[in-house]
């Protein structure tokens, strides 16, 4: 076996060291962020009693800091976005990779990736102007700024991530898997749902996790289409979050 020249071994050592230092620095910066957040947030837990912090009233100007409405509102909106985006995103990825003709795939793939780059402020404005009135008419609510509207916008924002990564995971499944299933008498749909998707399960789960992470981390669009008021949603019939008061809007802006 031919031995590597010392010059190549030295270059390999440098590259390996740089990669290792990059990974360690990423972990170090994340730890610094966590320490900074803990240091800045610790006084809040000392000044505000836990029973007030986990209360149901959020009026910071009047001294009420209950975060339960904020948590429940975020959970409701995220669950709605996941329910809407995951089935649609997976079905679209299957269509693009397994069903659509080549020329359709060449059009849809770049278009979906472009949609992922639309700023959240633009999507929030479109949701406020276009989607909210439609939801208001459909639900018969006093306003279209509802949890459902927020879920629709978050689902739209998570879809490009779920579709793109799921499509890549499905494309990575070896062609021999498909040929073997078809040779055993499986139909095209049976091959997709019982062979291809299970084989791409890890990539699909990663796509869902990244899409959900995008939905959870979004703030601006949700604030614009849900009314920016911290009130408790009380079910599908009253999915309205409501419109923030003037003082609440001023406080949230500050």
Q: How should these model regions be labeled?
A:
Residues 113-151, 155-158:
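Generic hydrophobic transmembrane alpha-helix motif, especially the helices
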Residues 28-31, 74, 78, 82-90, ...:
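Hydrophobic positions within alpha-helical transmembrane segments of bacterial inner-membrane proteins
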Residues 165-166, 170, 188-226:
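Transmembrane alpha-helices
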Residues 70, 74, 110-113, 117, ...:
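Residue-level signal for discrete positions within transmembrane alpha-helices
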Residues 119, 184-185, 198:
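Glycine/proline-centered hinge or cleavage motifs at structural transition points of membrane proteins
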Residues 215-249:
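Glycine-rich helix-loop "coupling/hinge" segments at transmembrane-helix boundaries
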Residues 2-18, 38-81, 101-105, 249:
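Periplasmic/extracellular loop-to-transmembrane helix junction in inner-membrane transport proteins
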Residues 4-7, 80-112, 133:
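Transmembrane-helix boundary motif in ABC transporter permease subunits
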């Amino acid at each position: 076996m031919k031995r590597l020249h010392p010059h190549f071994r030295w270059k390999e050592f440098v590259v390996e060291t740089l990669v290792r230092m990059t990974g360690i620095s990423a972990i170090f910066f994340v730890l610094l962020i966590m320490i900074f957040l803990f240091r800045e947030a610790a006084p809040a837990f000392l000044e505000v009693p836990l029973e007030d912090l986990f209360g149901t009233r959020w009026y910071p100007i009047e001294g009420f800091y209950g975060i339960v409405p904020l948590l429940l509102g975020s959970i409701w909106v995220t669950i709605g976005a996941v329910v809407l985006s995951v089935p649609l995103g997976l079905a679209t990825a299957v269509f693009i990779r397994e069903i659509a003709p080549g020329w359709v795939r060449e059009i849809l793939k770049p278009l979906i990736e472009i949609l992922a780059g639309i700023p959240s402020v633009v999507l929030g404005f479109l949701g406020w102007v276009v989607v909210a009135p439609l939801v208001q008419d459909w639900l018969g609510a006093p306003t279209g700024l509802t949890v459902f509207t927020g879920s629709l916008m978050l689902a739209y924002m998570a879809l490009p991530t779920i579709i793109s990564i799921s499509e890549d995971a499905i494309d990575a499944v070896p062609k021999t898997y498909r040929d073997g299933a078809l040779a055993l008498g499986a139909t095209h749909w049976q091959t997709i749902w019982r062979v291809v998707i299970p084989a791409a399960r890890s990539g699909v789960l990663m796509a869902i996790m990244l899409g959900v992470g995008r939905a959870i981390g979004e703030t601006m669009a949700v604030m614009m289409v849900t009314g920016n008021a911290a009130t408790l949603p009380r079910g599908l019939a009253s999915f309205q979050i409501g419109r923030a008061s003037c003082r609440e809007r001023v406080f949230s802006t500050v």
